[in-house]
Design a protein with these regions (language model features):
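A structural micro-motif
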Residues: 10, 42, 60, 98, ...
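Hydrophobic/aromatic beta-strand patches that form the interior of the parallel beta-sheet core
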Residues: 13-15, 45, 79, 120-122, ...
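Rossmann-like dinucleotide-binding cores of NAD(P)H-dependent redox enzymes
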Residues: 1-71, 129-136, 144-177
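Short, solvent-exposed coil/turn elements at secondary-structure transition points
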Residues: 50, 56, 112, 125, ...
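Glycine-rich phosphate/pyrophosphate-binding beta-alpha loops
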Residues: 124-131, 164, 192-197
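Structured beta-strand/loop patches that form or line metal/cofactor-binding pockets in enzymes
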Residues: 54, 169-198
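Conserved beta-strand termini and adjacent loop/short-helix elements that scaffold enzyme active sites
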Residues: 47-49, 103, 188-190
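FAD-site-proximal beta/loop scaffold in flavoenzymes
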Residues: 73-146, 153
Length: 198
């Protein structure tokens, strides 16, 4: 959303609790984005958490803590984008004999079956990543299984994407995950400068 508001003329400050932006992606693909937004935005604050926000006559005063310093800044508007809160525990799945997990997700197997073998679930309610194209693929798998076909869902086959400028996308294990799991891998690199969308 910061990209959209910046394009519309807003001044932007990004606050990220992790040590880099888009922590789910490998650092080598987020570095070009970080470099670009750091030049465009007022600030990109990493390893920083918001300690509070107070409406004042001058705007919204926000407190930040980096572990080293505590400070405040005043903004016209604040957009909080910390993820999604799932409402799977409010679907009434228990009435069908399905118990959501501790985070509210409906547990499913690779065929998208719930704990009740005749009931299937797909989409955000079954877990990460919460992406429309992931849900569509899960739905296809469920339909094929219901039709008697052999099918299984593999979340690693689903691309992740950040609609930023430059756009970032990845699929499969990240390089960091492959290293951590001791999996041999090959890495391909395509320079941003060669992209027609830069």
């Amino acid at each position: 959303m910061a990209e959209v508001y910046h394009a519309l003329g807003s001044r932007i400050t990004v606050v990220e609790t992790m040590g880099r932006i888009i922590p789910g992606a490998d650092a080598d693909i987020t570095r070009p984005l970080h470099k670009r937004i750091a030049a465009r935005y007022d600030e990109v604050l990493l390893k920083t958490r918001v300690t509070g926000a107070t409406v004042t006559e001058n705007g919204i005063e926000v407190g930040f803590e980096t572990g080293v310093e505590i400070r405040t800044a005043t903004f016209d508007r604040v957009l909080v984008a910390t993820g999604r809160r799932l409402s799977g525990d409010r679907l009434g799945a228990q009435a069908a004999g399905i118990t959501p997990d501790a985070r509210g997700f409906i547990p499913v197997d690779a065929q998208m079956r719930t704990t009740q073998p005749h009931i299937f679930a797909v989409g955000d309610v079954v877990g990460q990543p919460m992406l429309a194209h992931k849900a569509a693929h899960e739905g296809k798998v469920a339909a094929e299984v219901i039709a008697g076909e052999k099918a299984a869902f593999d979340p690693l086959a689903i691309p992740s994407v950040a609609y930023t400028d430059p756009e970032i996308a990845w699929a499969g294990l990240t390089e960091t995950d492959a290293k951590a799991k001791g999996i041999a891998y090959e890495k391909g690199v395509f320079p941003w400068a060669a992209s027609g969308r830069r």
